[in-house]
From Swiss-Prot:
GO terms for molecular function: asparaginyl-tRNA synthase (glutamine-hydrolyzing) activity; ATP binding; glutaminyl-tRNA synthase (glutamine-hydrolyzing) activity. Keywords: ATP-binding, Ligase, Nucleotide-binding, Protein biosynthesis. Heterotrimer of A, B and C subunits. It comes from Sulfurimonas denitrificans (strain ATCC 33889 / DSM 1251). SUPFAM superfamilies: Glu-tRNAGln amidotransferase C subunit (SSF141000). This is Aspartyl/glutamyl-tRNA(Asn/Gln) amidotransferase subunit C. Allows the formation of correctly charged Asn-tRNA(Asn) or Gln-tRNA(Gln) through the transamidation of misacylated Asp-tRNA(Asn) or Glu-tRNA(Gln) in organisms which lack either or both of asparaginyl-tRNA or glutaminyl-tRNA synthetases. The reaction takes place in the presence of glutamine and ATP through an activated phospho-Asp-tRNA(Asn) or phospho-Glu-tRNA(Gln).
């Protein structure tokens, strides 16, 4: 895939981003490198690689979920809100 200014303009439009003129050449270059890297990955022969292959035989260790709530952080955030209730932001209803 060729990354050029036309493609960058299309990506810019699709992502609702505005890229300044002085950064366009640099971004085209970076995107080209990324695309070339991915194209190189697609050339790898993985025909004989087991689908469940992993670099380590160790299983993923799970940690116990523990709820933690630092109320001082909540208070410092919510004190800047125009309106809050029960540790939540209160916002105007926008859907009928």
């Amino acid at each position: 895939m060729q990354v050029d200014d036309v493609l960058l303009s299309r990506l810019e439009k699709l992502s609702f981003l505005k890229i300044s003129e002085d950064k366009r050449e640099e971004i085209v270059s970076q995107l080209s490198e990324i695309v070339n890297f991915v194209e190189n990955l697609s050339l790898l022969d993985t025909q004989n690689v087991d689908e469940k292959f992993a670099m380590s035989n160790d299983s993923t260790f799970l940690r116990e979920d523990t709820a933690f709530c630092d109320t001082s952080i909540n208070e410092s955030i919510l004190k800047n809100a125009p309106l809050s209730s029960d540790n939540f932001f209160v916002v105007p209803k926008i859907i009928e």
